[in-house]
C-alpha cells in the first residue's frame, strides 16, 4: 500500500482503476463504488488507486471545522479493507483550486496518472469553480483513453446515501439512520 502526496506515480501505479472523491466516512454508497472497482480489479488484473483531497474542498472554502466523518488514518484503514493499492492524498489549497477542469483531465489524469477506468459518483464535480462534471469526463473518454464507470447512486427510501445526508442525520441525532447508511 502506498500513499502519494502528489500525482507523480510510480510506473506500476499508472494505468490503474482510479476512484476520485473525498470518501468521507466510506458509507454504503461509497462501498458500492469500491465493490465495483474490486470486481474490475479481479477481472482486468489492474491496481486500484484513490485520489482524495485534504482538506475536503468544502472545508477549505467555508472554513469549516469538525466537518469530517473520518480522519485520514481511518480513511486509510477503510481503503485497505476495500482492496485499494495506493492513494493520492492531494493537498487542496488556493493553487490547486484554480486548476481548470480541462487541465485536471489533461495535465493530471492523462499526463500523470493515465487511468484505464475512472470511478466517480453522479454528483462528482471538479476543476476551478466546480466546472467539470461526469458529462465532461465521459465526452473526453476516447480522446484520453479512459472509461468512466458511474454506478447508479445507492438510495435509502427516496434519499441518495451521501456524506451530507449522514452529517445532517448526525446533527439531528438520528443515530439509527446514520448506522444504516454506514
Describe these PLM feature segments:
Residues 1-182:
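Nucleotidyltransferase catalytic core that binds NTPs
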Amino acid at each position: 500500500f502506498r500513499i502519494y502526496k502528489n500525482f507523480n506515480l510510480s510506473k506500476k501505479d499508472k494505468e490503474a482503476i482510479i476512484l476520485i472523491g473525498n470518501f468521507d466516512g466510506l458509507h454504503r454508497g461509497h462501498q458500492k463504488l469500491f465493490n465495483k472497482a474490486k470486481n474490475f480489479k479481479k477481472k482486468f488484473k489492474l491496481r486500484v488507486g484513490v485520489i482524495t483531497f485534504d482538506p475536503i474542498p468544502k472545508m477549505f472554502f467555508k472554513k469549516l471545522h469538525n466537518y469530517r466523518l473520518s480522519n485520514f488514518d481511518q480513511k486509510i484503514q477503510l481503503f485497505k479493507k476495500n482492496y485499494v493499492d495506493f492513494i493520492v492524498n492531494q493537498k487542496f489549497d488556493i493553487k490547486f483550486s484554480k486548476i481548470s477542469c480541462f487541465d485536471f483531465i489533461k495535465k493530471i489524469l492523462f499526463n500523470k496518472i493515465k487511468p484505464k477506468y475512472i470511478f466517480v459518483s453522479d454528483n462528482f464535480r471538479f476543476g476551478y469553480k466546480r466546472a467539470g462534471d461526469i458529462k465532461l469526463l465521459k465526452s473526453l473518454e476516447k480522446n484520453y483513453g479512459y472509461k468512466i464507470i458511474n454506478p447508479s447512486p445507492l438510495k435509502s427510501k427516496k434519499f441518495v446515501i451521501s456524506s451530507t445526508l449522514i452529517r445532517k442525520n448526525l446533527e439531528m441525532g438520528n443515530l439509527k439512520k446514520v448506522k444504516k447508511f454506514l
